[in-house]
Amino acid sequence: MYYIGVDLGGTNIAVGLVNENGKILKKGSVPTKADREPDEIIKDMAALCLDLIKEVGIAVGDVEYAGIATPGTVDHDSGYVVYANNLPFLNYPIAAKLTEFSGIKKVLVENDANAAAKGEAEMGASKGCNDSLMITLGTGLGGGIIIDKKVYSGFNYAGGELGHTVIEVGGRQCSCGRKGCWEAYSSATGLINMTKDKLA
């Protein structure tokens, strides 16, 4: 059996095709181009998945699961992205859409920072720990919380949305619409915006 992992970011979509031992057989990436319709983003994701399947020489039916790690609040039970401020997703059925556009039957979805935290808890830096916290930096700033070896999703699936913790009341404008969020200061986007302001 084969598996596909998708890292959907605000800047790039990265896809890897692995075998049952977790060996990466093929990987690729394309720009996300986040300023367009959600279906267009997922069509590019599906095309990249299908390209890798073809390059490895297997059939779509040989892929047991695809897993999508995406920013934002994610209802992993329904396969929906409830909200993502760096992507145009609002109550968007991302799992069903990847199935529709690629033919991959089983698609799992998780918040990207939660997926990274779970990966570290299973096989990485926090292996053997019951509880851990991971902070992810990229286009945005996220967090994954592990309690008793399980991902803590919190209220409305936003337990790890550390980037939207207000650290300065009335501070810098965040892409979520609030002011003073940690993400507005410490994400790549926040650092770029602060640099532009200083150079202006």
Residue ranges, per PLM feature:
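Short glycine-rich, Thr/Ser-proximal phosphate-binding strand/loop in the N-terminal lobe
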Residues: Y2-A47, Y80-Y83, Y157
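Glycine/GP-enriched mid-protein hinge/lid loop-to-helix segment characteristic of carbohydrate kinases
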Residues: G16-N19, S29, E37-E40, L108-E110, ...
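Short glycine-aspartate micro-motif
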Residues: Y3-D7, D62-G67, S132-T136, S175
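Glycine-rich phosphate-binding loop and adjoining helix at the ATP-binding site
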Residues: A34, P38-A46, L50, G61-A66, ...
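Short glycine/serine/threonine-rich phosphate/pyrophosphate-binding segments
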Residues: N12-A14, A115-A117, G140-G142
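Short glycine-rich anion-binding loops that position phosphate/pyrophosphate groups of nucleotides
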Residues: T11, P71-V74, G138-G140
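Small-residue (primarily alanine) positions within well-ordered alpha-helices
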Residues: G5, G67, A117, G143-G144
